[in-house]
A protein has these predicted regions:
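Conserved, short, structured surface segments that act as functional micro-motifs
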Residues: 172-213
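Short peripheral tails and domain-boundary helices/loops at the edges of structured domains
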Residues: 61-73, 161, 198-213
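Extracytoplasmic low-complexity/disordered linkers and repeat tracts associated with LysM-containing
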Residues: 1-144, 149, 153, 169-175, ...
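Active-site region of chymotrypsin-like
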Residues: 156-164
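A short pocket-lining beta-strand/turn micro-motif at the edge of beta-sheets
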Residues: 144-146, 156, 189-193
Length: 213
């Protein structure tokens, strides 16, 4: 069930989907408001019909709680088979590069930190950790500042938060190692890159997919 404060952008991130696709799949006329009692499809119409979520309360796009206070939305969908995961970027084949050169200042913690924080200076380059397509570029999620979300497959998304400058737009294809932003401290008390990896919408430790330094 969607909690008060959730938005289409948040729902997309938590379910590994492009929020604009969710708008299209549900024929939503006004993306700024989700109605009471509305059931949202979070997969294409041809997919499992069980991938729907009920709305608990109307919310506006800009009214988003801090990531530290949020709870994940768990979809009732079936897990993909081993073969389908392997075809769409399996654990065995999916590898990232470091999105920034700084040191890790905050490690992954599923209950407290949905990603890792990497230190740096204003203007330091932020790189795409793998090939993919930009599904979000903006500042619509409170607590993330200037945010970029890249979809790499039906399985994996990466998120890059607190940037000073965003250098890519939505629907743009990016290559591994491409500069997509400049590090900053938007919606943060210090300059850093908050980097998340989502597998089927669930936060996982990106360090397990990164090369050792």
């Amino acid at each position: 069930t969607v909690k008060p404060g959730d938005t289409l952008i948040r729902i997309g991130l938590d379910h590994g989907q492009n929020w604009r696709d969710i708008i299209r799949w549900n024929n939503i006329e006004n993306p700024n408001i989700i109605d009471v009692g509305q059931v949202l499809r979070i997969a294409p119409p041809s997919a499992d019909p069980s991938q729907e979520i009920a709305i608990a309360k109307p919310v506006q796009l800009g009214n988003v709680s801090s990531p530290a206070d949020e709870k994940k939305i768990t979809p009732p969908a079936e897990q993909p088979t081993v073969s389908s995961v392997r075809n769409e970027g399996s654990d065995e084949s999916f590898q990232l590069i470091w999105p920034a050169q700084g040191q890790i200042t905050s490690s992954f913690d599923d209950s407290k930190n949905k990603g890792i924080d990497i230190s740096g200076k204003n203007g330091d380059p932020v790189l795409a950790a793998a090939d993919g397509k930009v599904v979000y570029s903006g500042a619509g999620l409170r607590g993330y500042g200037n945010l970029i979300i890249v979809k790499h497959s039906n399985t994996y998304l990466t998120a890059y938060a607190h940037n000073q400058t965003l250098l890519v737009r939505e629907d743009q294809s990016v290559k591994k190692g491409q500069k997509i932003a400049e590090m900053g401290n938007s919606d943060s008390e210090q300059v850093k890159l908050h980097f998340e990896l989502r597998r089927l919408g669930k936060p996982v430790d990106p360090v397990k997919y990164l090369p050792q330094r």
